[in-house]
């Protein structure tokens, strides 16, 4: 499930490191976390939707890769991001 353009713009605005920032790991992880949370709530009512569940696993894997990259580059930003989005490691 995708997120609305307004919600996506809001997520980008709150997590951007500078004006016009859409590609930093913080913004990408925030957008993925929003999509993951939407899909998680979707699965509470649609338990047998295995096609979307595969997409969820792909999103989680992508987020994990971005978090691993950020951990290698700057551990302080990594820890702040985990805490901000309540991501378990």
UniProtKB/Swiss-Prot annotation:
Q: Which GO terms describe its cellular component?
A: cytosolic small ribosomal subunit
Q: Where is the composition biased (Basic and acidic residues)?
A: 1-11
An example molecular function term from Gene Ontology annotations: structural constituent of ribosome
Keyword annotations from UniProtKB, A to Z = Ribonucleoprotein, Ribosomal protein, RNA-binding, rRNA-binding
**Region annotated Disordered, chain positions:** 1-24
InterPro entries per UniProt: Ribosomal_uS15, Ribosomal_uS15_bac-type, uS15_NS1_RNA-bd_sf
Q: Which Gene3D superfamilies match?
A: 6.10.250.3130, S15/NS1, RNA-binding
Name the Gene Ontology biological process terms: translation
| CDD domains tied to this protein | Ribosomal_S15p_S13e
Function (record text): One of the primary rRNA binding proteins, it binds directly to 16S rRNA where it helps nucleate assembly of the platform of the 30S subunit by binding and bridging several RNA helices of the 16S rRNA.
Q: Which family does it belong to?
A: Belongs to the universal ribosomal protein uS15 family.
Can you state the subunit structure given in the record? Part of the 30S ribosomal subunit. Forms a bridge to the 50S subunit in the 70S ribosome, contacting the 23S rRNA.
Record protein name field: Small ribosomal subunit protein uS15
The organism encoding this protein is Bradyrhizobium diazoefficiens (strain JCM 10833 / BCRC 13528 / IAM 13628 / NBRC 14792 / USDA 110)
């Amino acid at each position: 499930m995708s997120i609305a353009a307004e919600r996506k713009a809001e997520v980008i605005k709150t997590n951007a490191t500078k004006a016009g920032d859409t590609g930093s790991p913080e913004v990408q992880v925030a957008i993925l976390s929003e999509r993951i949370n939407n899909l998680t709530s979707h699965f509470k009512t649609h338990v047998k939707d295995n096609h979307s569940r595969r997409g969820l696993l792909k999103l989680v894997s992508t987020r994990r890769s971005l978090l691993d990259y950020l951990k290698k580059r700057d551990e302080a930003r990594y820890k702040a991001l985990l805490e901000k989005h309540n991501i378990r490691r």
